[in-house]
Curated annotation (Swiss-Prot):
The protein, known as: Annexin A2-B
Lineage: Eukaryota, Metazoa, Chordata, Craniata, Vertebrata
Reported function: Calcium-regulated membrane-binding protein whose affinity for calcium is greatly enhanced by anionic phospholipids. It binds two calcium ions with high affinity.
GO CC term, one of those recorded: nucleus
Compartment(s) where it occurs, according to its Swiss-Prot or TrEMBL record: Secreted, Extracellular space, Extracellular matrix, Basement membrane
Subunit structure: Tetramer of 2 light chains (p10 proteins) and 2 heavy chains (p36 proteins).
């Protein structure tokens, strides 16, 4: 079993990090002395083993980088003439199958697939739609759009338009376009004050809410800029931005704005909160738990773990250990990367 290296480093500014580059804050590092053919052969043997050798499959796929997993899938197809996803579907089941199938997709493919599933059939899974659209960078959103087009032969924006309505639709479409300013190094205090004042005047100060103004500011300004805007906002409004959102809008739009503000202020804490919510009380919201563990493992899992421990007193590793079991638990703990 390859060792999982814990490499702490400075969090890169969003937009400057290539989607193909391993983040220093990810919990899963590329395996050294990697041999795709050897891994593919081991997975083939594990699948053919009577009862299936899940442990071997888990140990390989949770301890390789995304690029290495793509190489393994290619090598597997070359040697068996079968697609790795199809082979895993036939060999695994339940939550473990969901995790393993998620791991062998590229990040854009995974997000695109989750978004498609959230809008498939009757009704919309707004929770998934909001989480992904609110938390991804411009580059990630562009990559998701391309993957969505390639996988489903339609446009992401078109599906969002047909599956949502009203101001919630406007917010989701504006975010999905990925047009946020990401040059957060320059501080424009005049613009910060102007945006804070306009947010106040478009909401709490008036009767009714100018949602379009809120959408424009919150989907186009950089995260560092908006963090300062939200601070400045308190000098105009008797309520902070989150309290103002709760007073001004309701339903999916309220939920979306609140998720967006959390992502802007502290994205790792946002995901830590989501993970906690997925495991607190009786039962587990496996869909949320799996999606975050799979999608953040190479990006900021170490930072998420840090925020989780700081806020909830016990480690993410501990919570997963208490809330899951068996091979599914083992896979998630490997993605978590260690205890704190």
């Amino acid at each position: 079993m390859a060792l999982i290296h814990e490499i702490l480093g400075k969090l890169s500014l969003e937009g400057n990090q290539s989607s193909s580059r391993q983040s220093k804050l990810g919990s899963v590092k590329a395996a050294t002395h990697f041999d795709a053919e050897k891994d593919a052969a081991a997975i083939e043997t594990a699948i053919k083993t009577k009862g299936v050798d899940e442990l071997t499959i888990i140990n390989i796929l949770t301890n390789r980088s995304n690029e290495q997993r793509q190489d393994i899938a290619f090598a597997f197809h070359r040697r068996t003439k079968k697609d790795l996803p199809s082979a895993l579907k036939g060999a695994l089941s339940g939550n473990l199958e969901t995790v393993m199938l998620g791991l062998i997709k590229t990040r854009p493919q995974y997000d695109a697939s989750e978004l498609k599933a959230s809008m498939k059939g009757l009704g919309t899974d707004e929770d998934t739609l909001i989480e992904i659209i609110c938390s991804r960078t411009n580059k990630e959103l562009l990559d998701i759009q391309n993957a969505y087009r390639e996988l489903f032969k339609t446009e992401l924006e078109k599906d969002i338009m047909s599956d949502t309505s009203g101001d919630f639709r406007k917010l989701m479409v504006a975010l999905a376009k990925g047009r946020r300013q990401e040059d957060g190094n320059m501080v424009d205090y005049e613009k910060i004050d102007q945006d804070a004042r306009e947010l106040y005047e478009a909401g709490v100060k008036r009767k009714g809410t100018d949602v379009t103004k809120w959408i424009t500011i919150m989907t186009e300004r950089s995260h560092p800029h908006l963090q300062k805007v939200f601070e400045r906002y308190k000098s105009y409004s008797p309520y902070d931005i989150e309290e103002s959102i709760k007073k001004e809008v309701k339903g999916d739009l309220e939920n979306a704005f609140l998720n967006l503000v959390q992502c802007i202020q502290n994205k790792p804490l946002y995901f830590a909160d989501r993970l906690y919510e997925s495991m607190k009380g009786k039962g587990t919201k496996d869909k949320i738990l799996i999606r975050i563990m799979v999608s953040r493992r190479n990006l900021d899992m170490l930072k998420i773990r840090q925020e989780f421990k700081k806020k909830y007193g016990k480690s993410l590793h501990y919570f997963i250990g208490q809330d899951t079991k068996g091979d599914y638990q083992r896979a998630l703990l490997n993605l978590c990367g260690g205890d704190d």
